[in-house]
Structures are given as C-alpha cells and as structure tokens.
Amino acid sequence: NRTGWAAMPARFSRQKTNAMDMIEIDGSAGGGQLLRTALSLSLCTGTGFTMRSIRAKRSRPGLMRQHLTAVNAATRIGNACTHGAELGATDLRFEPGVVLPGEYAFATGSAGSATLVLQTVLPPLWRCDAPSRLRLEGGTHNPLAPSADFIADTYLPALKRIGIDASVELERPGFFPAGGGILHATVAPATALRHAEFLDRGALQSIEAVALLSGLSSSIGERELQTLGARFALPETALHLRQVRPSIGPGNALLLRVRHEHHTETFTGHGERGTSAENVAMRLADEARAWLGSDACVAEHLSDQLLLPMALAGGGAFTTPAISDHLRSNARLIGQFLPVGIEWIETPCGWRVTVAS
C-alpha cells in the first residue's frame, strides 16, 4: 500500500524575535487555505508567523478581500499585531495576543466567503471559557468555498463528534458574484475534545435534493431537481424547490444531502451564466456518485477540514477516497505548530488518515 506522512515537526524555521517564536511559512505553493489555517493555529498556540510569497502562483497573487477579512477577524478576536495586512500584500507577519470571547461582526464586502472566515475563527473561539456570537456578511454560496448548508449539515455535526458545539443560522443567502449574505454563528466553549473516528459511514438512510433560487425563474430549479431525481431515482418528496429571501443579487445553488447511519455529506453545485441547469445537476451528481462508489466515510472537501480539530484534540482518524493537495499542505502546516503526526495509508476502503500526538 502507498503511504504518506506529514512528520512531526514538518520543515520550518524559527526565529527568536521580541521574545516570541516566529514560524516562517512559504505561501507560494498554497492559497488562502494555507493562510487561514496558519491564523487559526497561531491563535490556538500563541506562536506567531511570517508568511511570504502569499498566493504567488495564482493569477492574482497576494491578499484578496476575503483573505484580508480573515486576517482582520483573527486580529480582532486574538488582539494580535499584524504587519502587511493590506490588499495585494504578498508578505504578512502575525503576532497573536490573547483570544477573547464575545460578540463579533465581520464583513468581506463582496462575495468573498463568509464561511471561510467563520472556519478561521472557530478553533480559537471554542478554546475560550465563554461562548461567542458572530455575524458574518459576504458570500454564503460561493463555488470556491464551503456553502452555509455544508457548514450546518456536515462540518458542524462532524465537529460535534469531536466535542465542539457550534451552530449557524442563515439570515440571507449571498450568491456569487454579488455576495451580501448574512450568516449568524454561535460557539460554545469546548471543555474536552475527543479522539473521533470517521471510518464507516454506515447504511444509506436518505438522499434529498434542494434547489435554492433568488431572483431567478423557478424553472431553473425544477430542471435541476428533475435531473438529480432521475440520476438517483429520488421520489418527489425528496426534491425541494426554495425561492429564498431576495439576496443582493440573483443566484442559484443546488444541494444534495446524502445521509448515512454515521455520517452526512452535503454536496453543493452553483448555477452560472452559460451553464444549463441540467449540466449543473449532472456535475453535482457525478461528484456525489464518485464518493458513493467508494467505501470511504468522508468526502474530499471535508477531509482536509477535519485535520485541524483532530490535531487540537490530540488524535483522530477518517477514511477518504483521495488525498487532496489541500490535505497535504494542511498536514505539513499543522506539523509546524503542533506536536502531532499525520499519516495516510491506502486501504481497500480508500485512504485512511490518522492524526496522533
């Protein structure tokens, strides 16, 4: 079997500066995910970092608005000092302070993802001794980020098994490219994290499809649902069309919730100009069927998002159909901040990923 290993510690350099250990991170190979993970880890460990060449290999390198919102959110909740926190910056220095619970409001000012900002601040806030409430404004259904529905139905229930209690409520959807969605979140103190295992998803219980529309013809959602219904032989009772509260701009998202005995996955498709409703549904169906055709418990998008909470808990394991680049880079970065090892090995049930202190 092929194996992979993100050793503890991974490659990094430390420099003593103003009595604080600073980790040097090469940001050229990763995207915003690398930055968000570094911000979370820095606040959780009290270790500062300097990230250089941020998103250097992207068509628009440097910090974009949603990345800057994540930096500013982390700075605010953690009373941190930053150098280079501005649009387009390719180098950032982040020196964490004391994380304080409370009520916070953050806005990306565009369709930049509100859910990615939420995932940045969740870990340090659940380590506080009092609850926090958040109001996040921006994109809630963005093709390059977890949807608000994925957060509510897949990500947070997975965290619950690790011992983390958080919830979200969607006040107003924010579709790409206009954004302007509003998402509320509450985070409770996590008094004891558990070593959770996501190895067997159990028996299939249900599949349901939801078409979300704002400012668009209902016929678009009807065609999407008809296509998904045919691909998965779904009854009419499993197909739901929702015209949601008007957002800042028109939009369409297509959701497929696949519930098994031990785990629920949420797949999200996004309507876009020039792509037919049928093609939106077919692409979503292909993604879901690829996961259903495996014996792995966790689908690709959730897999790299489980590493950080499992590392903070000191251990955990899951199976997933593939090892993504995001998972590899997340594993390497976590090893720079925390005394954990992350190993993956190919098995008949897919890749088994193990986090151990």
Enumerate the language-model features and the residues they cover.
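N-terminal basic/disordered segments at the start of proteins
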Residues: 21-42, 47
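A generic, well-ordered mixed alpha/beta core segment in the N-terminal half of proteins
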Residues: 68-169, 184
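Flexible, glycine/charged-enriched surface loops at secondary-structure junctions
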Residues: 81-85, 131-132, 163-173, 232-249, ...
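Conserved mixed alpha/beta catalytic, RNA-binding, or beta-rich assembly cores of soluble enzyme
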Residues: 144, 161, 200-300
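C-terminal functional modules
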Residues: 317-357
